[in-house]
């Protein structure tokens, strides 16, 4: 089996963490006997410095003609003062739009070795393992009309039936590979758009009777994620609610350096850590590569349909952490922090 991956390391620590992920991919090649073709392209500030644009046509075309895209991180102080349309964040929005990515997946998994790194008590977070499916292209961020004047501001929250259907199906399919439970988050007691959301999710559920479906209002969900995160398996929700809840979920794990993500469409998918480019530690071999390596696990699960390899990567991360290796962001007081390279090698050693 051959896989074609476009690697876009981006800026700051992106190059270092993607290098770690590529090293893991090379070890997986040896272990499983497949071939990975990796084509690297510039993106973000790194692309702007060379080509005068954050996202070139060549990079975009490569992303459209591969099996999956692996992104490191984009942005930094160097490019902050550019016009909005030339900023790295605008390029990220463009690539998501051009690839038709409509669902953002954010896992929240607490590794046993890191329960004390969470801001919550160990007995609350131990065993937490859920994923948030956030609709990415609809809702209040994109609804029209929108605007403001000196006296008022207005936005429109709109969802089309098909937008809800397609992300609901993704969530139900994922639940079948997990614990078989979906929690749909809305505000149907107040918002008509949430009433549509709930009706459509329940209609789709008719095709997935083997999966348990529950509903929860978003305000209660925010409380429950902090109070008892272990109760969740798959969360599916709209753009605004998902934006907020996925950040709340993320902090349960103890470090942004641990959190992978996936943005998925009907034909394409992009995988990336949720952390930024961290220019303050870039080039120092200090960054935590785990989120990027875990993003590769998501790639195998969702794009390549190899849940066995995805679980292998996740177990290797857990086993490496169990040996006591820690990068600076997850090191406890008195621990000796290891480098990006050393953490990568510790994970690879568990994959042999």
Swiss-Prot record:
The record marks 141, 187 as: Important for catalysis. Keywords: Amino-acid biosynthesis, Branched-chain amino acid biosynthesis, Cytoplasm, Leucine biosynthesis, Magnesium, Manganese, Metal-binding, NAD, Oxidoreductase. It is found in: Cytoplasm. PROSITE patterns: IDH_IMDH (PS00470). Pathway: Amino-acid biosynthesis; L-leucine biosynthesis; L-leucine from 3-methyl-2-oxobutanoate: step 3/4. Its EC number is 1.1.1.85. GO terms for molecular function: 3-isopropylmalate dehydrogenase activity; magnesium ion binding; NAD binding. Binds 1 Mg(2+) or Mn(2+) ion per subunit. Mg(2+) binds at residues 219, 243, 247. Substrate binds at residues 96, 106, 134, 219. Belongs to the isocitrate and isopropylmalate dehydrogenases family. LeuB type 1 subfamily. Homodimer. This is 3-isopropylmalate dehydrogenase. It comes from Chlorobium chlorochromatii (strain CaD3). The gene is leuB.
């Amino acid at each position: 089996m051959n896989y074609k991956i476009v690697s876009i390391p981006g800026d700051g620590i992106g190059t270092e963490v993607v290098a770690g992920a590529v090293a893991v991919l090379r070890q997986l090649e040896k272990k499983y006997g497949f071939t990975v073709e990796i084509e690297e392209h510039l993106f973000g500030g790194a692309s702007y410095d060379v080509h005068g644009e954050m996202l070139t046509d060549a990079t975009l075309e490569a992303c459209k003609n591969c099996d999956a895209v692996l992104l490191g991180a984009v942005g930094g102080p160097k490019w902050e003062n550019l016009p909005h349309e030339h900023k790295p964040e605008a390029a990220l929005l463009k690539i998501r739009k051009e690839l038709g990515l409509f669902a953002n997946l954010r896992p929240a998994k607490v590794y046993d070795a890191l329960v004390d790194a969470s801001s919550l008590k160990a007995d609350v977070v131990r065993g937490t393992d859920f994923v948030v499916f956030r609709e990415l292209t609809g809702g209040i961020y994109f609804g029209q009309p929108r605007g403001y004047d000196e006296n008022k501001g207005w936005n429109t929250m709109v969802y089309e039936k098909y937008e809800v259907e397609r992300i609901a199906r993704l969530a139900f399919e994922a639940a079948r590979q997990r614990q078989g439970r979906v929690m749909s988050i809305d505000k149907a007691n107040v918002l008509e758009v949430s009433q549509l959301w709930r009706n459509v999710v329940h209609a789709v559920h008719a095709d997935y009777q083997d999966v348990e479906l529950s509903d929860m209002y978003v305000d209660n969900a925010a409380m429950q994620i902090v109070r008892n995160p272990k109760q969740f398996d798959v969360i599916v929700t709209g753009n605004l609610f998902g934006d907020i809840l996925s950040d709340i979920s993320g902090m349960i794990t103890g470090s942004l350096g641990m959190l992978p993500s996936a943005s998925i469409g009907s034909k394409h998918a992009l995988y990336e850590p949720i952390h930024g480019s961290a220019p303050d530690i870039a080039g120092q071999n200090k960054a935590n590569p785990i989120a990027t390596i875990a993003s590769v696990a998501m790639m195998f699960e969702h794009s390549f349909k190899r849940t066995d390899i995805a679980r292998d990567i996740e177990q290797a991360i857990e086993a490496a952490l169990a040996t006591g290796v820690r990068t600076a962001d997850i090191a406890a007081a008195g621990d000796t922090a290891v480098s990006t390279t050393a953490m990568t090698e510790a994970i690879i050693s568990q994959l042999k």
